[in-house]
């Protein structure tokens, strides 16, 4: 990103109007002041860095709204990485090192899940680490997706058409069933699924919590693996997570300065890739699924402009009654909503969405983002699933 791109700002403040945090937290100066205006000051003197930038949730809604295409969110994230001299806390280490925590927790998932659901344990985490006791903590799977995949790797290799799956931390450590659902859907379309030779967390939690150098190292590892899949094997890379997809495509070059040139156009969200294949003439044997569902658009999905592909894909399911929520950010913003100081802001941001869901009369909520799923299931009475899971359920 050009460090002088803030000069394109015309001071219209439409970004502040679109900002979920500005609406509920008066302590945040807003994206215009935190981004373009603040950058002018920071370039003169780094001591003018404002700690309030930590309230930015990196939702990118300011960038979607900006008529001058100023990369406001990127400016803020880069400023935090460059000027914030605060040493990351143990809490931020625990929340951001998802590969480490997942590797340690999955072998003991039943014990870990039981412990973290106990009120005394959550009170202890609140007091010791400032992880808010009101936040429901994600559950771990007993065994990883990558380990399970070994049992089907030979079978997947038999398909003529292949894709590489960037599964991300959520599928690997928390919800392997989503990865299994994707394989089921792709196999039904005549496509086999490979995994990248090496995969690390996409880096978004690390960026958000002050571990930018670690995020950059992991990004380099992922880019090398993606380059092997795309350049050597000649197959595309798809992901089920909207945030992982966005990071691989856009955050790597814009925030981490990791070159993904020649790869970006070969990295796609699974729903978009599937829609394109159906549009090209491929078919899926889908049976009726008589459900009333509402779709929540994740922030990074909004930024990529790919919501329509997921919606059109879901409309291929017979009997499915689909309504798109008039929703903004759900408020969790990855690790942001787990932090004690952010919990009230997180829930206030999501409150309009929660009301819409409760008043919808729907059977189910659908979204492409795993942390949105956690927030919705904690804050409403409905279950939330990924679009791929609905497709898998509808397969005849």
From Swiss-Prot:
It comes from the Bacteria. [4Fe-4S] cluster 1 binds at residues 9, 12, 15, 66. InterPro entries: 4Fe4S_Fe-S-bd, 4Fe4S_Fe_S_CS, Cys_rich_dom, G3P_DH_GlpC_su, Helical_ferredxn. Pfam families: CCG (PF02754), Fer4_8 (PF13183). Residues 2-29, 45-76 form the 4Fe-4S ferredoxin-type domain. One of its GO terms (cellular component) is glycerol-3-phosphate dehydrogenase (FAD) complex. Its main location: membrane. It is found in: Cell inner membrane. One of its GO terms (biological process) is glycerol-3-phosphate catabolic process. [4Fe-4S] cluster 2 binds at residues 19, 56, 59, 62. Keywords: 4Fe-4S, Cell inner membrane, Cell membrane, Electron transport, Iron, Iron-sulfur, Membrane, Metal-binding, Repeat, Transport. It is a peripheral membrane protein. Pathway: Polyol metabolism; glycerol degradation via glycerol kinase pathway; glycerone phosphate from sn-glycerol 3-phosphate (anaerobic route): step 1/1. GO terms for molecular function: 4 iron, 4 sulfur cluster binding; glycerol-3-phosphate dehydrogenase (quinone) activity; iron-sulfur cluster binding; metal ion binding. Composed of a catalytic GlpA/B dimer and of GlpC. Electron transfer protein; may also function as the membrane anchor for the GlpAB dimer. PANTHER family: ANAEROBIC GLYCEROL-3-PHOSPHATE DEHYDROGENASE SUBUNIT C, GLYCOLATE OXIDASE IRON-SULFUR SUBUNIT. This is Anaerobic glycerol-3-phosphate dehydrogenase subunit C.
């Amino acid at each position: 990103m050009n460090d002088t791109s803030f000069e394109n700002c015309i001071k219209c403040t439409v970004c502040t109007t679109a900002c979920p945090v500005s609406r509920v937290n008066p302590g945040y100066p807003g994206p215009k002041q935190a981004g373009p205006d603040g950058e002018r000051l920071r370039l003169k003197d780094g001591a003018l860095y404002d700690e309030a930038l930590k309230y930015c949730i990196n939702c990118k809604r300011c960038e979607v709204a900006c008529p001058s295409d100023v990369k406001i969110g990127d400016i803020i994230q880069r400023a935090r990485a460059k000027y914030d001299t605060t040493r990351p806390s143990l809490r931020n280490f625990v929340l951001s090192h998802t590969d480490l925590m997942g590797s340690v927790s999955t072998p003991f998932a039943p014990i870990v899940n039981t412990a973290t659901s106990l009120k005394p344990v959550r009170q202890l985490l609140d007091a010791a680490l400032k992880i808010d006791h009101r936040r429901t903590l994600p559950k771990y799977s007993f065994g990883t997706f990558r380990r399970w995949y070994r049992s089907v790797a030979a079978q997947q290799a038999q398909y003529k058409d292949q894709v590489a799956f960037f599964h991300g931390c959520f599928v690997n450590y928390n919800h392997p069933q989503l990865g299994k659902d994707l394989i089921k859907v792709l196999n039904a379309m005549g496509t086999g699924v490979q995994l990248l030779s090496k995969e690390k967390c996409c880096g978004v939690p690390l960026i958000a919590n002050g571990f930018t150098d670690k995020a950059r190292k992991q990004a380099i590892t992922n880019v090398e693996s993606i380059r092997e899949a795309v350049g050597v094997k000649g197959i595309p890379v798809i992901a089920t997570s909207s945030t992982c997809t966005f990071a691989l495509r856009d955050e790597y070059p814009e925030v981490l300065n990791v070159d993904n040139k020649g790869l970006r156009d070969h990295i796609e969200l699974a729903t978009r890739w599937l829609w394109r294949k159906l549009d090209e003439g491929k078919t899926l044997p889908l049976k009726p699924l008589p459900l009333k569902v509402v779709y929540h658009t994740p922030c990074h999905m909004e930024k990529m402009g790919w919501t329509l592909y997921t919606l059109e894909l879901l409309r291929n399911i017979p009997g499915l009654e689909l309504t798109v929520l008039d929703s903004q950010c759900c408020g969790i913003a990855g690790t942001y909503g787990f932090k004690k100081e952010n919990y009230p802001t997180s829930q206030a941001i999501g409150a309009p969405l929660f009301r819409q869901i409760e008043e919808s009369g729907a059977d189910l909520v659908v979204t492409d983002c795993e942390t949105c799923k956690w927030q919705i299931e904690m804050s409403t009475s409905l279950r939330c699933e990924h679009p791929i899971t609905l497709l898998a359920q509808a397969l005849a």
